[in-house]
Amino acid sequence: VYEASRNLAITEIKVVTPMGPTTGISLGADTELPLLVPVLRAGLGMLDAALAVLPEARTGFIGLKRNEDTLQPDVYLDTVPGDLRGQPVMVLDPMLATAGSAIHACQSLRNANAGAITVVCVLSAPEGVEALRAAGTADAHVTASIDSHLNEIGYIVPGLGDAGDRQFGVD
């Protein structure tokens, strides 16, 4: 989230501490905060960290479950406002495997008139990175690491399995 926030405008501000005045930084007065959109359920694990960086950001949710036969996302929840009027968005999804969920979320956000869309991940597969790029629905993709490849059932290798299952203790 820090890296995805890199291009937000900042301004210097005066800060008074108990030991004396100093200069700090703040988001610029004209900076429009991105809408944070965790892809449920795994994206919930990234939301607290994103709100620690951008505490005044609004949040919307997109609930997607992967169809294990087609590997495509099925929507079960969408609380994103109907018209974002160009507001920037950060999609929070810890794993970018096939990119089906990220592409679907980004297309839904485009349909709601989102501004710049940044997909923020912890772990990605090269196939997912390429699929997201080819889809053209996201303006940027930020990931902490890119693993080797996808296996025959669309999981990242070596990866960590299902990120939501890991977070919520499901076997």
Say what each PLM segment does.
Residues 1-171:
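PRPP-associated nucleotide enzymes
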